[in-house]
């Protein structure tokens, strides 16, 4: 079976990465802004720790060396924040800046041009997703 080269952004503690790493696929990059999540991911995947970084995805896209975008990537995956789209959210946070982070996921995807994209999110983002897919 061919090994998949994958990137996981908004990776959290690595729930999505876990299955792919268990199948010995190649984690090329994992990014999250939360240092505790990154520490957990590095603990679970010490052999990939150099590819796991604690950084704001917006800064990564704007400031990172272009070598990240040179790798041949089969799969880009991630779970952009969902608080503003979740039906469990009882607060009115429609203007929460995290609601726009899916746009940076898409911008990252355009830069690396993966064969496949996997976005994990809540049902409430579906209306936004329809707008995204028409672009």
Enumerate the predicted regions with their spans.
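Conserved active-site and SAM-binding loop architecture
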Residues: 1-135
């Amino acid at each position: 079976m061919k090994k998949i080269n994958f990137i996981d952004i908004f990776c959290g503690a690595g729930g999505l990465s876990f299955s792919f790493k268990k199948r010995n696929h190649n984690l090329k990059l994992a990014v999250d802004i939360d240092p505790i999540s990154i520490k957990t991911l590095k603990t679970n995947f010490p052999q990939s720790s150099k590819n796991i970084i604690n950084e704001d995805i917006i800064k990564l896209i704007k400031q990172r060396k272009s070598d990240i975008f040179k790798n041949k990537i089969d799969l880009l995956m991630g779970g952009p924040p969902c608080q503003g789209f979740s039906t469990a959210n009882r607060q009115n946070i429609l203007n929460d800046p995290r609601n726009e982070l899916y746009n940076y996921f898409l911008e990252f995807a355009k830069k690396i041009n993966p064969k496949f994209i996997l976005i994990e999110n809540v049902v409430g983002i579906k209306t936004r997703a329809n707008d995204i897919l028409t672009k």
